């Protein structure tokens, strides 16, 4: 039996909004430590990994491991019925056919209840190796969103280059080229607006802007974003969901010919 109560439905709504254009069907894997999701996009270029830790729910109960196979378009339709401030409870039996969602209004006595039919989804689990990244950039999530959106008007690809001087996002397109350079700076009054760059060695990689713009839909979940780079390994873009819960996106770099 699974029973998981979220104080704010908005968290799940925003997570699903952020990933539904990348992934159509996926398993929510529930166990006693929380609810996890891992899925590749159709072209196998990007990977989504989410963890909602048990301590983010109150209460949280999961007696045995359950995989909830969900179509994200269908889940979006059900979640539209929830107000952001609603209390959301997820329930499922041990061998479930449906996921039960209950939305309770915190202001009125309204309770909405929906059953979402589940699917059998065969999903391979990819072991994501722990990587020591050459560069880790922590920056305001809306700034990262703006940079990717601005550069996408010029080109399909962006080169992200981190060195001791800062981090540079640059692109070249048919109409010209453009770049944005950020240097480390600390904003004491508004720490969320600080830019931190940790660097063990210089790194320069090229990525598809279409995917990065897509990842930035998760900006609604967190004020800051962490971008981790190493030569020849996928980029990691991580948004915190509070506590040790997270939403992570991995993106393979473009190599030589496909730039």
Curated annotation (Swiss-Prot):
Q: Provide the record's note on post-translational modification.
A: Monoubiquitinated on Lys-164 upon DNA damage, and then polyubiquitinated through 'Lys-63'-linkage.
Q: Which residues bind DNA?
A: 61-80
| Binding partners and assembly | Homotrimer.
- What is this protein identified as? Proliferating cell nuclear antigen
Species classification: Eukaryota, Fungi, Dikarya, Ascomycota, Pezizomycotina
Tell whether Zinc is among the UniProt keywords: no
Glycyl lysine isopeptide (Lys-Gly) (interchain with G-Cter in SUMO) crosslink, residue number(s):
164
The superkingdom listed in its UniProt entry is Eukaryota
Q: Which GO terms describe its cellular component?
A: PCNA complex
- Spell out the HAMAP family in the cross-references: DNApol_clamp_arch (MF_00317)
| MF-aspect GO terms | DNA binding; DNA polymerase processivity factor activity
- PROSITE patterns attached here? PCNA_1, PCNA_2
Any one Gene Ontology BP term: leading strand elongation
């Amino acid at each position: 039996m699974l029973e998981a109560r979220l104080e704010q439905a908005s968290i799940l709504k925003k997570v699903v909004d952020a990933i539904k254009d990348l992934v159509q069907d996926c398993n929510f894997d529930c166990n006693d430590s929380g609810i996890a999701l891992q899925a590749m996009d159709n072209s196998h270029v990007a990977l989504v990994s989410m963890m909602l830790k048990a301590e983010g729910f109150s209460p949280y109960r999961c007696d045995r491991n359950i995989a909830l196979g969900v179509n994200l378009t269908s889940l979006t339709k059900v979640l539209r019925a929830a107000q952001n401030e609603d209390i959301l409870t997820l329930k499922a039996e041990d061998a479930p056919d449906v996921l039960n969602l209950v939305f309770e209004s915190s202001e009125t006595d309204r309770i909405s209840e929906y059953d979402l039919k589940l699917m059998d989804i065969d999903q391979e689990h990819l072991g994501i190796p722990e990587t020591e990244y050459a560069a880790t950039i922590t920056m305001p999530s809306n700034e990262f969103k703006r940079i990717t959106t601005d550069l996408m008007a010029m080109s399909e690809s962006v080169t992200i280059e981190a060195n001791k001087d800062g981090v540079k996002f640059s692109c070249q397109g048919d109409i010209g080229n453009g770049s944005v350079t950020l240097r480390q700076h600390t904003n004491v009054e508004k720490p969320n607006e600080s830019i931190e760059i940790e660097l063990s060695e210089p790194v320069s990689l090229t990525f598809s802007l279409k995917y990065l713009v897509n990842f930035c839909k998760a900006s609604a979940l967190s004020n800051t974003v962490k971008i981790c780079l190493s030569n020849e390994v996928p980029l990691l873009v991580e948004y915190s969901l509070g506590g040790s819960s997270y939403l992570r996106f991995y993106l393979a770099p473009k190599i030589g010919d496909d730039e």
